[in-house]
Amino acid sequence: MIIKEFLTTEKAIKLIESQNTLTVIVNKEATKADIKREIEKMFNVKVDKVNTLITIRGEKKAYVKLKKEFNASDIAHRLGIL
């Protein structure tokens, strides 16, 4: 399993609304291509880009920006984030 959880922090919700970006905690071994493929398959959307970082806790966090024709807030509603 690549995706562990979707973040629901204040910053993550702001990114969903303002930049069409989902914030996800992923498996440490997952590559950007793996994350992109998983999100596209899971929600039937197109991903514009993926930025990743390792948090201080040692978790891998991914910022997944969707293409303009898709809406991150729709996905957030389906997941119960918004």
From Swiss-Prot:
GO biological process: translation
Transmembrane segments: none
Pfam family, one: Ribosomal_L23
Keywords: Ribonucleoprotein, Ribosomal protein, RNA-binding, rRNA-binding
GO molecular function: rRNA binding; structural constituent of ribosome
InterPro entries, per the entry: Nucleotide-bd_a/b_plait_sf, Ribosomal_uL23, Ribosomal_uL23-like, Ribosomal_uL23/eL15/eS24_sf, Ribosomal_uL23_CS
Entries under PROSITE patterns matching the protein: RIBOSOMAL_L23
GO cellular component: ribonucleoprotein complex; ribosome
Domain of life: Archaea
Gene3D superfamilies: 3.30.70.330
Assembly, per entry: Part of the 50S ribosomal subunit. Contacts protein L29.
PANTHER family in alphabetical order: 60S RIBOSOMAL PROTEIN L23A
Role according to the record: Binds to 23S rRNA. One of the proteins that surrounds the polypeptide exit tunnel on the outside of the ribosome.
UniProt family annotation: Belongs to the universal ribosomal protein uL23 family.
Protein name: Large ribosomal subunit protein uL23
Classification of source organism: Archaea, Thermoproteota, Thermoprotei, Sulfolobales, Sulfolobaceae
Gene name of the record: rpl23
